[in-house]
């Protein structure tokens, strides 16, 4: 059923493969979390939205509302770029100020092993999904792509739950859906990236486009081809099912603890556009 009005929410959650196997957020059975509505769909200028869950988190700053979408809003029959636009149009209508994301990634860095966690500070975008926007009326400066406040909360929570957590690193984004060849991995390593995945972009710049902060938490689920050793599907599957709850807890912790008015500087990275392009 399509819902007409988008509920207000301070936080948006782009759930990824890190929490795909988990009933987020209800499955946490966390006293801080109250699910307000599930299976919410909205009509957007980019098509019907994916399903959203509306929930509330009680933390040190009181209550915060959030809208969460599973697997970045991707589904069969919808282009990934359209799914992202639908998702972030809903976030914009809801008044979202902070966006959190999770996902599984492959290691490009020989020091990163499966089940390690990276809270990245930068990214390299090799996708074809860059010329998209919800508003498109601002210059999006990427000097500081990740919100330092959200980043700090994700890192702090992850450090309490996982054995090895890294607070600095670059995420290289590809279109997918296939995995990379050894030659491609070798090339990508030369670009200075530490992990590779398919979901940080366009989310990271669509968040800035709508005036929201962004940070993500990503678990290494496999080695890139030619890195350390060949990965095994059974290990990748085990990670998806065994680690999802703790990744979800990190996201909820960040919602509960983050300061909505932190002096993070993210909005200084967003300036009015100087290009007044004609509309078709």
Please tell me what each predicted stretch does.
Residues 158-194, 265-280:
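Active-site/ligand-binding-proximal alpha/beta "capping" segment
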Residues 1-142:
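Metabolite-binding pocket within alpha/beta catalytic cores that recognizes anionic/polar moieties
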């Amino acid at each position: 059923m399509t819902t007409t009005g988008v509920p207000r929410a301070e936080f948006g959650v782009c759930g990824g493969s890190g929490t795909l196997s988990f009933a987020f957020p209800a499955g946490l059975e966390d006293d801080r979390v109250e699910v307000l509505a599930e299976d919410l769909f909205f009509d957007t200028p980019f098509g019907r939205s994916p399903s959203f869950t509306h929930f509330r988190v009680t933390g040190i700053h009181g209550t915060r509302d959030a809208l969460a979408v599973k697997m970045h809003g991707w589904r069969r029959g919808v282009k990934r770029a359209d799914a992202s636009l639908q998702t972030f149009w809903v976030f914009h209508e809801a008044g979202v100020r902070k966006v959190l994301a999770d996902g599984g990634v492959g290691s490009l860095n020989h020091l990163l092993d499966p089940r390690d966690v990276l809270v990245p500070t930068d990214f390299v975008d090799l996708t074809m999904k860059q010329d998209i926007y919800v508003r498109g009326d601002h210059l999006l400066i990427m000097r500081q792509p990740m919100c330092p406040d959200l980043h700090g909360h994700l890192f702090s929570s992850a450090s309490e739950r996982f054995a090895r957590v890294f607070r600095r690193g670059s995420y290289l984004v590809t279109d997918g859906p296939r995995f990379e060849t050894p030659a491609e991995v070798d090339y990508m390593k030369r670009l200075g990236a530490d992990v590779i995945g398919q979901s940080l972009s366009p989310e990271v710049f669509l968040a800035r486009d709508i005036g929201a902060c962004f940070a993500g938490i990503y678990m290494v689920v496999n080695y890139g081809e030619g890195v350390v050793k060949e990965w095994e599907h059974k290990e990748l599957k085990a990670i998806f099912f065994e680690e999802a709850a703790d990744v979800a807890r990190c996201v909820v912790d960040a919602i509960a603890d983050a300061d909505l008015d932190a002096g993070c500087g993210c909005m200084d990275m967003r300036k009015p556009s100087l290009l007044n392009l004609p509309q078709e």
